[in-house]
């Protein structure tokens, strides 16, 4: 997917949904309308009842996503330095060791992590990206923020390979957690394929600004 060709409305739509659902998978209670207010206007409705931490968990997605987009536009490969940058953005004002791999007995856990190797077909590429996500979450290289970071860098790889973004909705949390726990990459592929097909339709609807189709997809 060429980010430059995306409309601003669809770019913001991806960002809002990614922030809402990715944070929601970790227990964030901020609603989708409140997420729109945070991402677009930088304000949190007083009626939301959200904590300061929840606000930053949402707001930090904006700087992380925009950094990711900048790297992708420059056609930069996903190196460990970029992963650390994205983690630092997502955990800004939330943890003291942002952007740093955790250490146990002087061993850097993140050193075990490697990004997906090149693959030939689209299915091979998608399978490799999903498997890398499973392994990233298994390793848990950071002290906190692994879920949000893992999903962001998974989308980095997907967008770089021409796929739509994979936004895992918080309503699918039980299935998603099960897929990670069992490391069932084939079932994850089936789950992701259906979700990506839906996202492709949403992208097309945004390009034609067909509001009725957008509502149907939702």
PLM region spans:
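FIC/Doc superfamily catalytic core
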Residues: 1-218
């Amino acid at each position: 997917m060429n980010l430059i060709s995306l409309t601003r409305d669809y770019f913001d739509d991806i960002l809002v949904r990614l922030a809402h659902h990715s944070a929601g998978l970790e227990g964030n209670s901020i609603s989708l309308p409140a997420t729109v207010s945070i991402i677009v206007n930088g304000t949190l409705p007083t009626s939301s009842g959200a904590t300061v931490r929840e606000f930053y968990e949402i707001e930090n997605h904006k700087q992380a996503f925009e950094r990711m987009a900048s790297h992708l536009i420059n056609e930069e490969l996903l190196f460990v330095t970029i992963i650390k940058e994205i983690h630092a953005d997502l955990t800004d004002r939330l943890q003291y060791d942002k952007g740093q791999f955790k250490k146990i007995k002087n061993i850097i856990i993140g050193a075990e992590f490697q990004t997906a190797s090149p693959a030939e077909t689209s299915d091979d590429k998608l399978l490799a990206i999903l498997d890398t996500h499973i392994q990233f979450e298994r390793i848990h290289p950071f002290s906190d923020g692994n879920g949000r970071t893992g999903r962001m860098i998974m989308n980095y790889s997907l967008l770089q390979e021409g796929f739509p973004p994979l936004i895992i909705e918080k309503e699918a949390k039980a299935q998603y957690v099960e897929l990670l726990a069992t490391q069932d990459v084939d079932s994850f592929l089936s789950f992701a394929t259906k979700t990506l097909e839906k996202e492709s339709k949403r992208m097309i609807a945004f390009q034609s600004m067909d509001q009725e189709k957008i509502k149907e997809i939702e």
